[in-house]
């Protein structure tokens, strides 16, 4: 857990500019608990305000080793076993999928999560939109979920980067 907080703090500080020792850490915007298709808790998601940006940290345990695509999805619902209730990728600007796509990418496109042989993994990133724009999309009337997929995201194939089956999901809760 301390590694997670250190990673979040480092990203938040790099996004938010200089800070002095002892300054209050960036405020948490939202969080969620990731659950597998069988209902087991397999990780956490934390979103932090970082200046005009939003930092996201995903930390997991008990997932299959390998590289997994992760995305923010349009509906704050995680009905197992397939998590189809989470809808498609969060894409308020109607962009193409993938960070390698020259036409731009979805707000919901995130870096792949690498899970080691122990079943643990962690990734921290910055969302693509400003905090004000991201907040409006994340916390609209039906909310937002984050989904972990069985396969890696290739960062370009529309609409989902060939990431495969949805294996874990969390509904983001404000605060």
Question: Where in the sequence are the language-model features?
Answer:
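N-terminal leader/targeting pre-sequences
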Residues: 16-67, 72-175
């Amino acid at each position: 857990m301390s590694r997670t907080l250190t990673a979040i703090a480092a990203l938040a500080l790099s996004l938010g500019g200089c800070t002095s020792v002892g300054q209050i850490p960036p405020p948490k915007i939202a969080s969620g608990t990731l659950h597998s298709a069988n209902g087991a808790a397999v990780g956490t998601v934390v979103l932090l305000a970082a200046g005009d940006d939003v930092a996201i940290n995903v930390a997991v345990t008990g997932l299959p080793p390998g590289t997994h695509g992760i995305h923010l999805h349009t509906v704050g619902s995680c009905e197992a076993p397939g998590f189809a209730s989470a809808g498609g990728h969060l894409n308020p600007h109607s962009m193409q999928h993938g960070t390698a796509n020259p036409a731009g990418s979805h707000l919901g496109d995130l870096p792949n999560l690498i899970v080691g042989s122990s079943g643990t993994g962690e990734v921290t990133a910055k969302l693509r939109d400003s905090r004000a724009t991201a907040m409006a999309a994340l916390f609209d009337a039906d909310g937002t979920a984050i989904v972990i997929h069985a396969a890696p995201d290739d960062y370009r194939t529309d609409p989902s980067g060939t990431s495969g089956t949805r294996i874990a999901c969390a509904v983001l809760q404000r605060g």
